[in-house]
Amino acid sequence: MKAKYVFPSDYMADPAANVFDGKLYIYPSHDYDSGECFDDDGGHFQMKDYHVLCIDGDPMEQDAKDCGKQFGIEDIPWVEKQLWDNDCVEKDGKYYLIYSAKDYTGVFHLGVAVADKPEGPFVPEADPIRGSYSIDPCVFKDDDGEIYVYFGGIWGGQLQWYKDNKMLKAEHLPEGKEDPLPSRVARMTGDVKQFAEAPRAVIIVDETGKPLPADDPHRFFEASWMHKYNGKYYFSYSTGDTHLLCYAVGDNPYGPFTYQGVILEPVVGWTTHHSIVEYKGKWYLFHHDCVPSNDTTWLRSLKVAELEYDAEGHIKTVK
């Protein structure tokens, strides 16, 4: 399953691929060299604007087209810096881009921007989503029309500072056989601008129903993604410091999700972030690596590979 670069003319990462109006749209973060030094909290990822990419043909043959800059830090009153991952969903002819960014107190929140077309232009709301925190939103529209946002990331994503949706006085990173820090999920309001409920923990369990422990190399770290296949809910994610993309399967949007296996083995570069989408009868994995930038971890390039399932619905590992 050979992968190809999607947009070789610029550094883009964290691709959220969606199909709207028969076209493939990609909502990435936009890397650039800010001059910041590498640190474990991601201070070297100083992205300052968002672009939308589009493909109307075979993504394994055609490069993506840049639909242009959508908005930047200067357009969002509550944001100081670091426009990180984003995703988009359609409802009633409107398009809602949910993104993560850091406010003037150094805390990450989720924001919403709205457009009349999937390619934009997107206009950001003046305030973040109430009760939101951390990073890496994935917006999932279920078959019944309900919309959910999955989010969360450890270390620079600040998830270790929260418990029961409240900020702690001191961070806590679970170790050993402790329960790991989970992703979060919340159903959205009808206008797709606020949480309709308090975020819940997304629990990943083994085949016996026991949660994966904090020291398991396949536990959640960041980069939540949700898709459905044959009526099942596939929750996929990055393991962060073990550099894998893994997945787990459940029977509803909230889980629990039973761990299944590895989707993508480690790539060149520290981060691994992805999306999975069906387009024109084929399934695709979008992700990124740092080969074109000679392993500069904050200068990443988008890639795509065909994704295959076996007869039992297991995803075949992309090597």
Swiss-Prot record:
<keyword id="KW-0119">Carbohydrate metabolism</keyword>
<feature type="site" description="Important for catalytic activity, responsible for pKa modulation of the active site Glu and correct orientation of both the proton donor and substrate">
    <location>
        <position position="136"/>
    </location>
</feature>
<feature type="active site" description="Proton donor">
    <location>
        <position position="222"/>
    </location>
</feature>
<keyword id="KW-0326">Glycosidase</keyword>
<dbReference type="Pfam" id="PF04616">
    <property type="entry name" value="Glyco_hydro_43"/>
</dbReference>
<feature type="active site" description="Proton acceptor">
    <location>
        <position position="14"/>
    </location>
</feature>
<keyword id="KW-0858">Xylan degradation</keyword>
<keyword id="KW-0511">Multifunctional enzyme</keyword>
<dbReference type="InterPro" id="IPR023296">
    <property type="entry name" value="Glyco_hydro_beta-prop_sf"/>
</dbReference>
<dbReference type="InterPro" id="IPR006710">
    <property type="entry name" value="Glyco_hydro_43"/>
</dbReference>
<dbReference type="GO" id="GO:0045493">
    <property type="term" value="P:xylan catabolic process"/>
</dbReference>
<keyword id="KW-0378">Hydrolase</keyword>
<comment type="similarity">
    <text>Belongs to the glycosyl hydrolase 43 family.</text>
</comment>
<protein>
    <recommendedName>
        <fullName>Beta-xylosidase</fullName>
        <ecNumber>3.2.1.37</ecNumber>
    </recommendedName>
</protein>
<dbReference type="GO" id="GO:0009044">
    <property type="term" value="F:xylan 1,4-beta-xylosidase activity"/>
</dbReference>
<keyword id="KW-0624">Polysaccharide degradation</keyword>
<comment type="function">
    <text>Exoxylanase capable of acting on certain xylans and xylooligosaccharides.</text>
</comment>
<dbReference type="InterPro" id="IPR052176">
    <property type="entry name" value="Glycosyl_Hydrlase_43_Enz"/>
</dbReference>
